[in-house]
From Swiss-Prot:
It comes from Mycolicibacterium smegmatis (strain ATCC 700084 / mc(2)155) (Mycobacterium smegmatis). It holds the Pfam family Ribosomal_L1. It comes from the Bacteria. Disulfide bonds: none annotated. One of its GO terms (biological process) is regulation of translation. Gene3D superfamilies: 3.30.190.20, 3.40.50.790. This is Large ribosomal subunit protein uL1. Transmembrane segments: none annotated.
Length: 235
């Protein structure tokens, strides 16, 4: 839905810009303002009160959404031998080592998440400049550098998402599809926000959640009350 289209303007008119919606209200309105031509992804954008330039104010983490993302993630795994077999059995879409690295160096990036066993990280480091900017670099803090590759694959396939603050102190994550019931969207939102709150740096001063917006990939942004940090399914 183009922002210049009549349908988008009509959808945007349904959003009261003077109001801060509850998570449940925002989820319901996101569904109503989404394009009916496709099952759009529902996204959350948060402006944080941190300074990402400071190492001790980096916010990142993972969360298993209780109702999944509505999307089956494509997972690449860097592993060899028995670990490679375990990854394949768990449903990994592509598994390899030097061959996979060479493929990525050649431009292959048809996956949504990457996992590596610890012994592969020295090799994976060769493509850090390719994977890092795209949020695909395996990292122990997000559980994607692990000897238990099978569990890591299953977690991601089951709805595990990663979040990381960007250079502008913004953080983005998805909470499902427009076809989801609004209660499920609100519960996914709550699970993710709980982890964002847990990840608050001790050195962060002042208001941590400055601005929260919910939208679909085809609809307008909906302002959410950042003070609502519990009872997410209440209107």
């Amino acid at each position: 839905m183009s922002k210049n289209s009549k349908a988008y303007r009509e959808a945007a008119e349904k959003v009261d810009r003077t109001k801060l919606y509850t998570p449940l209200e925002a989820a319901k309105l996101a569904k109503e303002t989404s394009s009916k031509k496709q099952d759009a992804t529902v996204e959350v954008a948060i402006r944080l009160g941190v300074d990402p330039r400071k190492a001790d104010q980096m916010v990142r983490g993972t969360v298993n959404l209780p109702h999944g993302t509505g999307k089956t993630a494509r997972v690449a795994v860097f592993a060899v031998g028995e670990k490679a077999e375990q990854a394949q059995a768990a449903g990994a879409d592509i598994v390899g080592s030097d061959d996979l690295i060479e493929k990525i160096q050649g431009g292959f990036l048809d996956f949504d998440a990457a996992i590596a066993t610890p012994d592969q990280m020295a090799k994976v480091g060769r493509i850090a400049r390719v994977l890092g900017p795209r949020g695909l670099m395996p990292n122990p803090k997000t559980g994607t550098v692990t000897p238990d590759v099978a569990k890591a694959v299953q977690d991601i396939k089951g709805g595990k998402i990663n979040f990381r603050v960007d250079k502008q102190a913004n953080l983005h994550f998805i909470i499902g599809k427009a076809s989801f019931d609004e209660t499920k969207l609100a519960e996914n939102y709550g699970a993710a926000l709980d982890e964002v709150l847990r990840a608050k740096p001790s050195s962060s001063k002042g208001r941590y959640l400055k601005k929260v917006t919910v939208s679909t990939t085809t609809g307008p942004g909906i302002p959410v009350d950042p003070s609502v940090t519990r009872n997410f399914t209440e209107a």
